[in-house]
């Protein structure tokens, strides 16, 4: 069977880092016989510039027809003055919603070669391996009513709605428990059940779902404490289950424990197993076009795609080993460079990983 991948480079550094992931994909195709086809489409600011919308119909149709999606990044200051409905990020949110990509997997793994790049002491972060499972299509980012208005005192007022249904919570909880079963069988659910009724329900439903997974140790933590614990003792966590907004914040916090946000991939999955894969970092418009962006997160996103959407653990492990080898050889992009390493650009890092892949 030939895998069909929709490629959405997006904005900023997106096209540069996606190009390196495609080098790796081409190597898997030419050297290891992976049957794969790719087709490109626009999303985000690039799509708005070309079509007047951040999420063109053609892009949605391509993504629906594809087996999986590889995304670069969206957004940038150029499009910030636009109406909220036309901003690049709305294209990404629309894609998640249309394809029902409800389960966002964000690993935070510290490579042994990069322990010194973390802002925390080596004894605190060495061996870090956390998986954050974030609900992606509900919560305050999608809740209605939302908007801005003038209140009865004549003041401007903004309002959003935090809402989750029982079925939405149950669905993401099952996803998190299943992932925990494949790891170290520990799941910590993050909420604010002491002040928010929505997350009080979240905790109740997670406890109910947990009864189906007696082999997984379930714990609960308020989000403010979770943020503190990620800095104080991050290795206490295995799998963290969060709602949309809490996960958005905590996953970036966890990412910086690893030394660079440029190292971390993510997966957004539908119940069918179809997924969208992207680095967790943004479009970094300040370095776009300079050839210095770190492509590793995007390359590892490709590895996650092969593992989670196509059950191809062999190819995923080949990519992971190739990344490890390139790091062992001392290659570093600017964001992870340190004394005694070889600082290289985006393309050179991609080339080093491809060379290591061929030698695996």
From Swiss-Prot:
SUPFAM superfamilies: Isocitrate/Isopropylmalate dehydrogenase-like. It holds the Pfam family Iso_dh. Its cofactor is Mg(2+); Mn(2+). One of its GO terms (cellular component) is cytosol. Mg(2+) binds at residues 224, 248, 252. Its EC number is 1.1.1.85. Its main location: cytoplasm. It comes from Methylococcus capsulatus (strain ATCC 33009 / NCIMB 11132 / Bath). The lineage of its organism: Bacteria, Pseudomonadati, Pseudomonadota, Gammaproteobacteria, Methylococcales. GO terms for biological process: L-leucine biosynthetic process. Substrate binds at residues 96, 106, 134, 224. Binds 1 Mg(2+) or Mn(2+) ion per subunit. Keywords: Amino-acid biosynthesis, Branched-chain amino acid biosynthesis, Cytoplasm, Leucine biosynthesis, Magnesium, Manganese, Metal-binding, NAD, Oxidoreductase. One of its GO terms (molecular function) is 3-isopropylmalate dehydrogenase activity. Pathway: Amino-acid biosynthesis; L-leucine biosynthesis; L-leucine from 3-methyl-2-oxobutanoate: step 3/4. It catalyses: (2R,3S)-3-isopropylmalate + NAD(+) = 4-methyl-2-oxopentanoate + CO2 + NADH. This is 3-isopropylmalate dehydrogenase.
């Amino acid at each position: 069977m030939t895998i069909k991948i929709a490629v959405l480079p997006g904005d900023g550094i997106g096209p540069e880092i996606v190009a390196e992931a495609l080098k790796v994909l081409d190597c898997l195709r030419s050297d290891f016989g992976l049957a794969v086809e790719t087709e490109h489409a626009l999303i985000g600011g690039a799509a708005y510039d070309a079509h007047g919308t951040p999420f063109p119909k053609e892009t949605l149709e391509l993504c629906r027809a594809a087996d999986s999606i590889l995304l670069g990044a969206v957004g940038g200051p150029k499009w910030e003055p636009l109406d909220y409905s036309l901003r690049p990020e709305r294209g990404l949110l629309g894609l998640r919603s249309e394809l029902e990509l409800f389960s966002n997997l964000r690993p935070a793994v510290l490579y042994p070669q990069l322990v010194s790049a973390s802002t925390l002491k080596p004894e605190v972060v060495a061996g870090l391996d956390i998986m954050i499972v974030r609900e992606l299509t509900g919560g305050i980012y999608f809740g209605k009513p939302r908007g801005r208005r003038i209140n009865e005192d004549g003041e401007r007022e903004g309002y959003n709605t935090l809402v989750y249904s029982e079925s939405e919570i149950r669905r993401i909880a099952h996803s998190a428990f299943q992932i925990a079963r494949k790891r170290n069988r520990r799941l910590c659910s993050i909420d604010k059940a002491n002040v928010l009724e929505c997350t009080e329900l979240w905790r109740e439903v997670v406890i109910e779902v947990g009864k189906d997974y007696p082999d997984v140790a379930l714990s609960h933590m308020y989000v403010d404490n979770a943020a503190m614990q990620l800095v104080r003792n991050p290795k206490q966590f295995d799998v963290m289950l969060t709602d949309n907004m809490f996960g958005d914040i905590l996953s970036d916090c966890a990412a910086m424990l690893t030394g660079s946000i440029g190292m971390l991939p993510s997966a957004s999955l539908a119940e069918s197993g179809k997924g969208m894969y992207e680095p967790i970092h943004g479009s970094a418009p300040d370095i776009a076009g300079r050839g210095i962006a770190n492509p590793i997160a995007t390359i590892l996103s490709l590895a996650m795609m092969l593992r989670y959407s196509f059950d191809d653990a062999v190819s995923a492990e080949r990519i992971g080993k190739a990344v490890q080898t390139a790091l062992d050889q001392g290659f570093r992009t600017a964001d992870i460079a340190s004394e005694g390493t070889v600082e290289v650009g985006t393309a050179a890092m991609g080339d080093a990983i491809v060379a290591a892949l061929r030698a695996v």
